[in-house]
């Protein structure tokens, strides 16, 4: 079920990572501006912890999830109706709203996992959840991208995005979730929640967990830029041929090649590899140290980035590098979710709020890492972009590894089933 929950959450993120860069790049917007747009659409996820407590109250989290998916899907649909580049402001405004509501979908999912799962299940759940988040959400954006290149109307590919956000969310209605029990008034309940969260954050596990999430490690930030940089790999590869063609024919050739490459990297093959990486990562995280696996995800990200940086700027480099990055991205996100769920532990009352604090920190890291990466495009080209991403991951892995080793904050290496509580006996 968490695969479907992840898909509902992942559609707006995939829009930001795949469809939005493709649409604005197609409208002849510079990659430098795309970096600003991606950063803008991540802003709601930085502050969602401020309003995330709402899903810890009133109706069940699964009902919140469906309601938020309906609103977010409608916002994405309207965003797709805007003409670029003339209506880029309302285009981004409705996408911004979709991200705002989808962030709360993530809060619902985190709360459901934290409250209902035992420790030995957290990696598995995180794997399937991120398979839906990345692969399921990514497929929606890929379908919309291909529909765009094939000349479909905005209402058609916008409708696909909305349907793939709302449809999977409805499956969560079949998940068993106990009714909410609120002690005292709403104000008193909110006060208790704030105290619980504040006390948790000042523990060693809370502080080091936030630092880990704020770092560039395992952010897989380049996943948000691949559809934007694809054109650079094409124009470099076809420079001689493009010089001989009229402007319209050259633009059509580039567009065809870009669509083909995005279809491979972000399509069924790429999303399938992402799902494999997420499920495998979740399996591994249930059997070893989760924080160590999170640091390993940063090393793997850097390895792919360095490989692309030192390879020729060609379509082959983009395709093979992008597919490897897709595989590693799944591993990164599964390790992130498993690490966060382990850090906050089993909690029914404030689970969504705690989970959102960590995901907000992680989204800040994704945004600033991608933003810094994109600054290297004008001076060093795409090799500088992927090289910067690798350097940030390596530096953060070294620093955090030393900090965790010094503080003894790597967490548990074994995740055994939690013992059942003894049944009370009535003495006659």
Regions found by a protein language model. Give the residues of each.
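Helix-loop boundary and gating motifs at the non-cytosolic
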Residues: 1-45, 207-212, 216-233, 237-239, ...
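Glycine-rich segments within core transmembrane alpha-helices of 12-TM secondary carriers
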Residues: 45-48, 123-144, 359-370
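Helix-to-loop junctions at the C-terminal end of transmembrane segments
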Residues: 46-60, 276-290, 377
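Cytoplasmic membrane-interface "Motif A"-like loop-to-helix N-cap segments
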Residues: 57-70, 286-299
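C-terminal ends and interior cores of transmembrane alpha-helices
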Residues: 66, 70-85, 299-313
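Intracellular juxtamembrane helix-capping segments at the cytosolic ends
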Residues: 104-117, 331-347
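Juxtamembrane intracellular "pre-TM" segments in multi-pass secondary transporters
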Residues: 180-209, 242-251, 422-424
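C-terminal transmembrane helical hairpin of 12-TM major facilitator-type secondary transporters
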Residues: 291-336
């Amino acid at each position: 079920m968490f695969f479907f929950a992840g898909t509902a959450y992942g559609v707006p993120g995939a829009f930001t990572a795949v469809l939005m860069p493709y649409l604005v790049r197609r409208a002849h917007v510079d990659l430098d501006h795309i970096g600003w747009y991606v950063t803008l659409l991540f802003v709601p996820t930085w502050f969602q912890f401020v309003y995330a407590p709402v899903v810890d109250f009133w109706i069940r989290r699964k009902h919140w999830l469906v309601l938020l998916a309906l609103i977010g899907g409608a916002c994405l649909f309207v965003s797709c109706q805007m003409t670029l580049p003339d209506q880029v402001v309302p285009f981004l405004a409705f996408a911004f709203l979709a991200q705002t509501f989808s962030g709360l979908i993530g809060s619902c999912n985190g709360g459901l996992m934290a409250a209902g799962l035992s420790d030995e299940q957290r990696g598995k759940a995180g794997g399937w959840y991120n398979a839906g988040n990345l692969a399921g959400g990514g497929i929606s954006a890929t379908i919309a991208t291909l529909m765009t290149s094939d000349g479909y109307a905005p209402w058609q590919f916008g409708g696909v995005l909305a349907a793939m956000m709302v449809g999977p969310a409805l499956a969560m209605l079949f998940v068993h979730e106990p009714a909410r029990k609120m002690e005292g008034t709403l104000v008193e309940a909110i006060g208790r929640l704030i105290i619980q969260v504040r006390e948790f954050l000042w523990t060693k596990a809370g502080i080091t967990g936030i630092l880990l999430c704020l770092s560039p490690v395992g952010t897989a930030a380049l996943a948000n830029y691949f559809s934007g940089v694809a054109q650079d790999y094409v124009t470099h590869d076809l420079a001689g041929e493009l010089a001989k063609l009229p402007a319209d024919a050259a633009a059509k050739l580039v567009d065809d090649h870009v669509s083909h490459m995005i279809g491979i990297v972000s399509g069924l093959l790429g999303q399938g590899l992402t799902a494999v990486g997420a499920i495998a990562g979740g399996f591994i995280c249930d059997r070893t140290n989760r924080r160590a696996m999170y640091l390993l995800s940063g090393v793997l990200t850097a390895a792919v980035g360095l490989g692309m940086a030192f390879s020729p700027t060609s379509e082959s480099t983009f395709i093979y590098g992008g597919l490897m990055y897709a595989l590693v991205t799944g591993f990164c996100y599964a390790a992130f979710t498993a690490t966060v769920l382990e850090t906050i532990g089993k909690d029914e009352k404030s689970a969504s709020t705690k989970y959102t604090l960590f995901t907000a920190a992680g989204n800040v890291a994704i945004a600033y890492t991608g933003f810094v990466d994109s600054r290297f495009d004008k001076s060093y080209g795409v090799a500088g972009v992927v090289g910067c991403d690798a350097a940030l991951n390596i530096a953060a892995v070294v620093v955090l590894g030393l900090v965790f080793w010094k503080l003894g904050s790597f967490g548990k290496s074994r995740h055994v089933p939690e013992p059942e509580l003894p049944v009370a006996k009535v003495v006659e």
